[in-house]
Amino acid sequence: MEPAVSLAVCALLFLLWVRVKGLEFVLIHQRWVFVCLFLLPLSLIFDIYYYVRAWVVFKLSSAPRLHEQRVQDIQKQVREWKEQGSKTFMCTGRPGWLTVSLRVGKYKKTHKNIMINLMDILEVDTKKQIVRVEPLVSMGQVTALLNSIGWTLPVLPELDDLTVGGLIMGTGIESSSHKYGLFQHICTAYELILADGSFVRCTPSENSDLFYAVPWSCGTLGFLVAAEIRIIPAKKYVKLRFEPVRGLEAICEKFTHESQRLENHFVEGLLYSLDEAVIMTGVMTDDVEPSKLNSIGSYYKPWFFKHVENYLKTNREGLEYIPLRHYYHRHTRSIFWELQDIIPFGNNPIFRYLFGWMVPPKISLLKLTQGETLRKLYEQHHVVQDMLVPMKCLSQALHTFQNDIHVYPIWLCPFILPSQPGLVHPKGDEAELYVDIGAYGEPRVKHFEARSCMRQLEKFVRSVHGFQMLYADCYMNREEFWEMFDGSLYHKLRKQLGCQDAFPEVYDKICKAARH
């Protein structure tokens, strides 16, 4: 009884403090208090609910039976929109704060919201090596199910809450992408509802133009209702090697070399300064040396990027065996390294042991509670960007990142970009090795001004035929955007499928003016 009374007293004192100081003051200056007392428990409740729901739905096999009914309901909503005169554009009815991005789309308030309640795994076919899923299935759901039956996705993007729909309509990448490409390149079929309410299935051989135009289109060609994705046999562990490297030239040379070696299942780099990095390479295995087993995903373990940094500080190479699912979600607990700015003591051993089992807070709840003042502060003093550039331009790109934003650590993830139709492809006719440069944090460049600095960075990326991930703030104008992306097939299909009066153009959904 005494702990309950103490907790009640603490809660009462906190509420009185909030009343005196004001909620906005607390959310800005003591955000960690609000996050620890409210968002962490709420996030845990969300996770438990969705895990239990997904488990029950899959065990009862109810998702396939309900799927057709849900798709018909979406078709009905689209046809009703047409009957009512098609007065506004359509978009999904999913609230903007639920998406894994820093901003919320303004268009949700002005467009016709089509409710899409599709969040289940429909089928796992191990003979065809395919999993069929609905668009709101998360990576956490996928790994929980597939790994338990000995399978996995060839490319399984990092954060638990990333959804299949977001990874197709936007993009997704992981440290296996040097072998398999982006998330779109492991997809074998898409099912969509078009602007007229009709259903269509597209594959590389059936409705192929639409199949190649859907990725990166952000829901502006139709509503995704299901996807078929390749699966491969999984093993229990990842045998991961850590190698600290110093000197930018040596870093680029080592990273490029390891990215070209297809015997590596996983390749990743963490850059802690312009001339200090740790390059990691891994292979899946069922064998393990018990003394080198590291369950890095356990709640009491150090954050992964801090653990990796120790190899740099001690200037030693390392070899560890990490459980496969722990490896896939190695950056989840610390949201890469963003959580250190929200909970500064989050990696403290005492905090990890007492409260680490509730970490991380859900990104969607962080967005929902950030408030206008905090949003503006983040916009001017915080960067979250992923720029995709040819591997041959890595050194030049890292110098540009250093000069324009100066954010560390930097995430380096290689990927092969096939020469295929669509919004994103190499400049030549052959596949090319690219690298995702991820910068997340507070810029340390003097006199940082978000718009001018980011426009400078975007200009560089365009000049080397690179691409900007569309979840991030985009300061390009329309002409610059279509200089970066190949819109030829996309615009052809927009006209052919009657999308011009049904959905906004992709630029109008992702540009800075379209988000707040």
Curated annotation (Swiss-Prot):
Keywords: Cholesterol biosynthesis, Cholesterol metabolism, Endoplasmic reticulum, FAD, Flavoprotein, Golgi apparatus, Lipid biosynthesis, Lipid metabolism, Membrane, NADP, Oxidoreductase, Signal, Steroid biosynthesis, Steroid metabolism, Sterol biosynthesis, Sterol metabolism, Transmembrane, Transmembrane helix. FAD binds at T163, V164, G165, G166, L167, I168, M169, G170, T171, G172, I173, E174, S175. It is a single-pass membrane protein. Residues 58-234 form the FAD-binding PCMH-type domain. Pfam families: FAD_binding_4. Its cofactor is FAD. The record marks L122, E123, V383, V384 as: Cleavage. Residues 1-22 form the signal peptide. Pathway: Steroid biosynthesis; cholesterol biosynthesis. Gene3D superfamilies: 3.30.465.10. Residues 53-516 are cytoplasmic. Its EC number is 1.3.1.72. One of its GO terms (molecular function) is Delta24-sterol reductase activity. The chain crosses the membrane at residues 32-52. One of its GO terms (biological process) is cholesterol metabolic process. Catalyzes the reduction of the delta-24 double bond of sterol intermediates during cholesterol biosynthesis. In addition to its cholesterol-synthesizing activity, can protect cells from oxidative stress by reducing caspase 3 activity during apoptosis induced by oxidative stress. Also protects against amyloid-beta peptide-induced apoptosis. Interacts with DHCR7; this interaction regulates DHCR7 activity. This is Delta(24)-sterol reductase. It comes from Rattus norvegicus.
